[in-house]
Structure formats: C-alpha cells, structure tokens
C-alpha cells in the first residue's frame, strides 16, 4: 500500500506438510493485488494469493474464506457486474453467504464448483474451462444449495 509491503505469505512444497502456508499476524482488511484489478471487468474471488496468481486475470485473494469489509465495500461501490466466487470445497457455506449478499446488491454472481481442488492445484487451463462453463447463480439455485447442506 503506497509502495509499502502490506502482506506476505510463505508456502511449503513438501508432500503432505503439516502446515502448508505461513501467513503474518496482521490485518487482512486489504485488497491484495489491487494495482492489477480492473474494477469494470468480471472479478474472481479466491482464497489465497497462489490461487490468484494461477488464475492470472482479475483475481482477488480473500486471504481466507471471508470477504473483508474494505473489499466488500469496494466491490459493491464499483461498476463490476459479474463476480465469480471460487472458494475451496470446504468453504461452501461461506461461498453461498457471499453469493447471497452480492446477489442482493444487484451483482451477477457465479459460484465456481472446484471439485475438491483449489485453482492452484488444478492449473490455469482447467480453471479457465470451469469459469467458461459456470452459469450465474439465481436465488432459487442458491436456496437449493443452502438446503442441501442441512
């Protein structure tokens, strides 16, 4: 932010490490890679910075499963129409919550179903195909998905 380092992360590449990522203890209410975001084009929200780097275009890592207040405000106030939510399979409840909120804000929302792998694991080509084949979620489908989790 303003030319200053505001976040970093480390990753182990060992097979089945106990701790895969190491993140600093600091506020996550930032917009990572903000300099590279086109707020007029579709956004892709993912969990981590390595996922965002794999996705390459207009991807914002949430640094977890939740959308922080600063980012949420920026999305709602922006002219962006389409938002793809690509959280890991274990974060489906949070993903549906984000879908519902953004739908209520008048955004066109797409829930990208990752089939057990995160974007970094599946790679750019596979993830791009998933995006291309994802349809917008509507209130009815959202409700069906929420009920299926009960």
Where are these regions (language model features)?
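Alpha-helix N-cap/loop-to-helix initiation residues
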Residues: 68, 91-93
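Extracytoplasmic/secreted cell-surface and envelope-processing proteins
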Residues: 54, 93-95
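Replication-associated primase and helicase/ATPase modules
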Residues: 2, 45, 76, 81-86, ...
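Phosphate-handling DNA/RNA-contact segment within nucleic-acid enzymes
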Residues: 1-82
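Anionic group-transfer/hydrolysis microenvironments
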Residues: 49, 88-90
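Residue-level detector of alpha-helical recognition elements and their boundaries
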Residues: 17-18, 90, 134
């Amino acid at each position: 932010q303003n030319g200053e380092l505001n976040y970093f992360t480390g990753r182990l590449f060992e097979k089945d490490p106990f701790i895969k990522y190491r993140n600093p203890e600091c506020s996550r209410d930032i917009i990572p890679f903000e300099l590279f975001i086109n707020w007029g084009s579709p956004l892709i929200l993912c969990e981590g910075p390595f996922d965002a780097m794999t996705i390459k275009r207009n991807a914002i890592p949430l640094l977890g499963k939740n959308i922080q207040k600063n980012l949420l405000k920026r999305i709602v106030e922006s002219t962006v129409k389409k938002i793809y939510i690509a959280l890991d399979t274990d974060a489906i409840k949070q993903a549906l919550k984000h879908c519902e909120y953004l739908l209520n804000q008048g955004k066109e929302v797409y829930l990208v179903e990752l089939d057990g792998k995160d974007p970094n694991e599946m790679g750019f080509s596979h993830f791009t195909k998933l995006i291309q084949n994802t349809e917008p979620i509507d209130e009815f489908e959202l409700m069906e998905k929420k009920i299926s989790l009960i």
